[in-house]
Amino acid sequence: MTRSSNQLTDAHLRPDPSDIHRLLAGEHHDPHSVLGAHEYPGHTVIRAFRPHAVKVTAVIGGERHVMQHLESGLFAVAVPFTNLIDYRLEIDYPGVGDAVVTHTTADAYRFLPTLGELDLHLFAEGRHERLWEILGAHRRTFTTADGPVSGVSFAVWAPNAKGVSLIGEFNHWGGNDAPMRVLGSSGVWELFWPGFPPDGLYKFRVHGADGSVTDRADPMAFATEVPPHTASRVTESTYEWHDEDWMTRRASLNPVFEPMSTLEVHLLSWRPGLTYRQLATELTEYVVEQGFTHVEMLPVAEHPFGGSWGYQVTSYYAPTSRLGTPDDFRYLVDALHQAGIGVIVDWVPAHFPKDAWALGRFDGTALYEHSDPRRGEQLDWGTYVFDFGRPEVRNFLVANALYWLQEFHIDGLRVDAVASMLYLDYSRPEGGWTPNQYGGRENLEAVQFLQEMNATVHKVAPGIVTVAEESTSWPGVTRPTNLGGLGFSMKWNMGWMNDTLAYISRDPIYRSYHHHEMTFSMLYAYSENYVLPISHDEVVHGKGTLWSRMPGGDHEKAAGLRSLLAYQWAHPGKQLLFMGQEFGQRAEWSEERGLDWYQLDEQSFSTGVQNLVRDLNAIYRSRPALWSRDTSPEGYSWIDANDSANNVLSFLRFGNDGSMLACVINFAGSEHSQYRLGLPHAGTWREVLNTDADIYNGSGIGNYGAVEATDEPWHGRPASAVMVLPPLSMLWFEPA
C-alpha cells in the first residue's frame, strides 16, 4: 500500500448512472466492478452498498475514512492510497431507539472469484465429476494483511438471469444488497460473503429473464430447513468414517455375483419419530437380526411434500433434514456398514416438482427442464422433466449420483421411473409428444445420460450397484455401455412381480388354469440381471398388502404368504421386500403412520412369517446355489414345470461351488401325501426348509427332516423320492 500526495477528488466517487440503476434494481452482472476498491491515478475509491446502514466507514490500518452516502444505500469514499491491500468496513445500523449497532467486516467485493477457469470449462462441457465442490455454499478462510477472513462462498448456475443476489438471515431476507457477479459466459453467479454464519440459512433472489423475481433454494444445497420451510442451510461435514473394511471389500466385489436380500425402508415411517442416529441403532439391529444383506431407502434427498414419499425432490444434494443433519445421515450409513449391511438409496433423475422456489424455470427460462413442454413436463405427476441433452443439466445429475456414492458412502442407486425417461411418448396422448431426430419414440438424450451416468459411477466407485426401475422390454438395460446397453447393474423384474402377485391372489382351486403365470418368468430370466421386487408400490393405493392378497382365512393367508416368500427367495434374481411385508402386515402402508409392530407382540402368524424371513435370509446367504449363478442358465433347471393339475412347481438351483438345492412348491390348498419328485441322484436329501413347520406357526406337516431318494427315474431324472407336500407350502432339499 502506498500513500499518495495527490489532491483527492470526488470525481470518481459516483459510478456511471447505468451501473447505479442496475445495482439498485438487482440486475447488475458485475457488481464487483462498481463496489469494493477501485484504483485511480493517485487515489483509490471504495464503494459499499448497504441500504439499511446509517453510516459506513472504511478502516485502513489505523485510519478511519467516513464514506459519503450517494443514494439509496450506496456509499463511497476516496482514500489517499494506491496498491491498497486490505481494509475493513465499519457499518452502523439503527438499533432500538437512538442506539446504533456497529458491525465490522471485510468487504465482500474485494475478493477474487472462488471458481477457476478449468472448473467452469469442465462444467460447461458437462464433465465436472465433483461439481459439488465448486457450486453451492462452501465455508472458506482467506489470509489477508489485516488477519484471516472467514466466511462462505456461494455459486449458482443461472445463465439467463438478469441478476442474482444472496439473501438470508444475515440481511433479514431482504433487498438486493448482496448482489452476485456472473463469471464470464459460464452463467455461474458467485460471491464470497465474509462473516456469514457457518450454519446460516440462505436463498438466491433471482431476477429472471422473463421479468420475474423469485427467491430460490440453492440447487446444490447440502442441507436445508426442515419442511415446510424451504431455505437452504450452510453446512460442512466433520464426520470421521469407520467403515474402511466395508469400503475396501466393496471395491473388490461385483454385486451381481453376490447375495443380495434387500429390505426396502421408508425411514420416516419405519418407526416414526426416530432420527438418523436413532435409526442407526434400531434399524441396524433389526436388519441384522432379520438377516438382510442390504437396506434400500426410499429417496432421502430433500422433498417438501411428505406424501410424495421422497419422489418429488427439490434439493438433490441434501439428505432430508426431517431426521437430522447430513453428518447424522452419514452416521446411519456408517453404522449399517460396520454391521455388514449395504445401503441403496432411491434416486430420482427423471423429473422434479414445479415449486416456484426450487428448480423449475430457475432463471426465468426453462433451465433444468426441457423447453418444449411436450418433452419437458410429466403430465401424470404434474412435474418437470430434466433436459438430458443440456451438458450442465447432465453434469448436475451425474455429479449428484457420484455425490451420494462418494460423500455418503452409498453402495447403490435404484433409479426411479426409468421407463418415463426412455420413451418420448411415455403416458402422452397422440399428438402430445415429438419424435427424435430419426422419427422414433426413443429419448436418445435420456439414453445417453443413463449410459454416461452408469459408466461414470462404475468407473469412479467400483463395486457399487445401479438398479433400474424399468417396466418395459427395453433391450440391454443391464448390458454394458461399451456393448450398447444402458449399463445398469440390475433391473427390477416387473413382469415376475405382476404375474406372481396375480397368481397368488387367486383361490387355489382356480390356480391350475393360470399355471403359466408362474413359469413364464423363466423364459426371460437371463435376458437381464434381475431384482425380484415386492416394493412399496404393491402395498399402497388400494392394492392392500401381501397378506390381504392371499385367499382364505388367517391360516391359509399365512401359509400362502410363507410359500410366496420362499418362492421369491428360490427364484433366480436378487430379493427386495418392502418393510412390514416381512412379518405379514395386514394394513396397507401409509407414510402418515408407522408399521403395525403390535402384530408381533405375541406368538402369531406374523411372528411365524418373520421367523421364516429370518431363516430364508440365513439359508440364502449360506447357499451359493441360491445366488452365485443368478445370471446364468447353468444355475437353474426345471424338475417339473408342467404339473398344473397339482399346482406344483419344482426345480433345481446350482452354485458355482458345485452345491445344489431341490425346490418344490405346492400352491394347492390340499396336501400331496405321496408326491414323487425326480432328483439328480439317489441318497438322503435333507429338508433345509419347510414353510409349514411349527416354528413358522404352520401345521407341522413334513418329512421328518429328510427324504430318501432311490434309483427310480422320474421327471427325466435318474432318481426320485416320495415326500409329503403340505398345502400352500414350499420345501427345499439338499444332498445330505
UniProtKB/Swiss-Prot annotation:
InterPro entries hit by this protein: A-amylase/branching_C (IPR006048), Branching_enzy (IPR037439), GlgB (IPR006407), GlgB_N (IPR054169), GlgB_N_E_set_prok (IPR044143), Glyco_hydro_13_cat_dom (IPR006047), Glyco_hydro_13_N (IPR004193), Glyco_hydro_b (IPR013780)
Naturally occurring in which organism (per UniProt): Mycolicibacterium smegmatis (strain ATCC 700084 / mc(2)155) (Mycobacterium smegmatis)
Family: Belongs to the glycosyl hydrolase 13 family. GlgB subfamily.
A Gene Ontology term for the protein's cellular component: cytosol
UniProt enzyme class: transferase
Function: Catalyzes the formation of the alpha-1,6-glucosidic linkages in glycogen by scission of a 1,4-alpha-linked oligosaccharide from growing alpha-1,4-glucan chains and the subsequent attachment of the oligosaccharide to the alpha-1,6 position.
Protein name: 1,4-alpha-glucan branching enzyme GlgB
Record SUPFAM superfamilies: (Trans)glycosidases (SSF51445), E set domains (SSF81296), Glycosyl hydrolase domain (SSF51011)
NCBIfam families in alphabetical order: branching_enzym, PRK05402.1, PRK12313.1
Active site: 416 (nucleophile), 469 (proton donor)
Catalytic activity: Transfers a segment of a (1->4)-alpha-D-glucan chain to a primary hydroxy group in a similar glucan chain
CDD domains, per database record: AmyAc_Glg_BE, E_set_GBE_prok_N
GO function term, MF aspect, one: cation binding
Coiled-coil boundaries: none
EC number: 2.4.1.18
One Pfam family named in its UniProt record: Alpha-amylase_C
Gene3D superfamilies linked: Glycosidases (3.20.20.80), Golgi alpha-mannosidase II (2.60.40.1180), Immunoglobulins (2.60.40.10)
Pathway terms, separated by semicolons: Glycan biosynthesis; glycogen biosynthesis
